Structures are given as structure tokens and as C-alpha cells.
């Protein structure tokens, strides 16, 4: 919820009111729900054609039009299509979640209108990355939102108000000290200070490769160097295009 609020505020919305999730709202009748909106002086409602409200989704977009005679404008939007792997689908939260599960990160980001993000507190790890020259900021997977598939991602990371290019691994680092749980590890390029305890935001740009168990530490280091060079080159090219 906090991440959604940040996205909405960054889009220019000045104030957010989150509808309380309680029986009186979830199981309300159509009229009770409409009165709830009227009592809060709602002046404009924008919903998709598949929007439902009230007990068991009894309320439909056309029911909202009843409030137009009370000075509330109602806009009902058509659902847009997108094509993925030769199949047309309606843009929906379910479709986006499926794309994320299928490693279709770039397509999911297009539909979201912004990159998938993960905000969390940096926790202490085994410092294995630091030992081979690639220190990471570690976070636990989110409990209340979909976690991306295991693998390596191109990311950018927000640390104390500044964005840095970065590489993120989601998995159990099988080459060194394989874990029995999934960790989100981000190697942030250009940050050389202690991040433990800080809240950071990782923005996921592109899926790079599957999690791989390398034959040796040297093979792993060579691959990480190659990925770093590729990510930094891409970041520089993006900066030039924006200039």
C-alpha cells in the first residue's frame, strides 16, 4: 500500500483517501455505498467497465451514474487490450501479475506505466558479495505483493534521495553458501557507505538471466563484471538520450 501511495503521489495526486476494508463497506448495498461517496463530497469518479462494488460485487459502473444528478461526474473507461506472445488480453492486475511470474518484466512495466518496485529495510547478510568485490544491500521478499521470479535483474536503486544504477539477484546465491530461503540482493554501483538499517527502493528494469550455479568463483566474478559493464553502459546511453 505504501508503494502504491508513492506512485500515486508522484503522478500529481495531492491527497489519497483509502477506503477502509470493513464489513460495512465490503458488504454494503448499492445505495449505502453511493451514500458513502456522497457524504464525502466526491466530485468525480473514474472506473473501468469491469468495476464492481458492494456486497458480492453487486454494484456496477452504470449504478454510479445515479450520482451525476448530485454534481458527481462519472467517467467509465473502456478496458484496453495488449498483445503478448501472439495473444490479445485485457489489461488487468491479474494479467500484469502473470507477466511478472512469467519473467515478462518489461511488458508488465509498460502496462503498469512505471517499473515494478520493492521498498524495504536493508538487512545484514553473510557479506559474501563484499568478499569478491560486489557488496550487496539485502532485503527479504515482500509478504504482501508478488515477488519476482528468481534470477538476475537490471535495476536502479533509490538511496537517501538519489537513484543509482544497480544489479539485483533474487534467489539463494547457489555458487557461494547456498541459502535455504530467497533473498533480494542488490549491488548498487557508486555507493560505498554502510546501508544497514536504511530504507531503499529498488526499481526493476529488465530481466537479465536465470540464477546460475557457476563452476568457480572466478567464473562468477567474470559474469558479474560483464553484467556491471553492460548495465553502466546502458545507463550512460539512457542519460545521453534524455540530455
Put a short name on every predicted segment.
Residues 1-69:
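N-terminal Rossmann-like or analogous alpha/beta NTP/dinucleotide-binding catalytic cores
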Residues 3, 107-114, 219-230:
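A non-catalytic, amphipathic alpha-helix used as a structural packing/dimerization or gating element
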Residues 8, 45, 108, 155, ...:
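Residue-level signal for inorganic ion chemistry
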Residues 16, 74-76, 202:
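Generic structural signal for residues in well-ordered beta-strands
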Residues 20, 78-80, 206:
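Residues at the C-termini of beta-strands that transition into short coil/loop
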Residues 71-169:
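Glycine-rich, Lys/Arg-enriched anion-binding loops that position phosphate/diphosphate groups
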Residues 124-243:
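Phosphate/ribose-recognition catalytic cores of enzymes acting on nucleotide-derived substrates
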Amino acid at each position: 500500500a505504501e508503494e502504491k501511495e508513492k506512485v500515486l503521489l508522484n503522478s500529481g495526486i495531492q491527497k489519497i483517501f483509502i477506503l477502509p476494508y470493513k464489513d460495512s463497506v465490503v458488504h454494503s448495498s448499492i445505495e449505502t455505498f453511493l451514500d458513502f461517496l456522497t457524504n464525502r463530497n466526491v466530485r468525480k469518479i473514474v472506473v473501468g467497465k469491469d468495476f464492481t462494488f458492494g456486497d458480492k460485487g453487486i454494484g456496477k459502473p452504470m449504478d454510479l451514474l445515479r450520482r451525476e444528478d448530485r454534481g458527481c461526474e462519472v467517467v467509465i473507461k473502456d478496458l484496453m487490450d495488449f498483445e503478448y506472445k501472439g495473444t490479445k488480453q485485457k489489461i488487468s492486475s491479474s494479467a500484469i501479475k502473470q507477466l511478472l511470474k512469467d519473467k515478462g518484466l518489461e511488458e508488465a512495466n509498460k502496462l503498469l506505466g512505471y517499473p515494478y518496485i520493492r521498498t524495504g529495510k536493508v538487512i545484514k547478510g553473510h557479506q559474501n558479495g563484499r568478499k569478491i568485490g560486489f557488496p550487496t544491500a539485502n532485503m527479504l521478499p515482500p509478504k504482501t505483493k508478488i515477488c519476482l521470479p528468481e534470477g538476475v535483474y537490471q535495476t536502479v536503486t533509490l538511496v537517501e534521495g538519489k537513484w543509482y544504477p544497480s544489479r539485483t539477484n533474487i534467489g539463494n546465491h547457489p555458487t557461494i553458501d547456498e541459502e535455504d530461503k530467497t533473498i533480494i540482493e542488490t549491488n548498487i554501483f557508486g555507493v560505498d557507505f554502510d546501508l544497514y538499517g536504511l530504507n531503499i527502493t529498488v526499481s526493476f528494469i529488465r530481466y537479465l538471466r536465470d540464477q546460475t550455479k557457476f563452476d568457480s568463483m572466478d567464473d562468477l566474478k567474470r559474469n558479474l563484471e560483464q553484467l556491471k559493464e553492460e548495465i553502466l553502459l546502458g545507463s550512460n546511453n539512457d542519460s545521453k538520450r534524455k540530455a
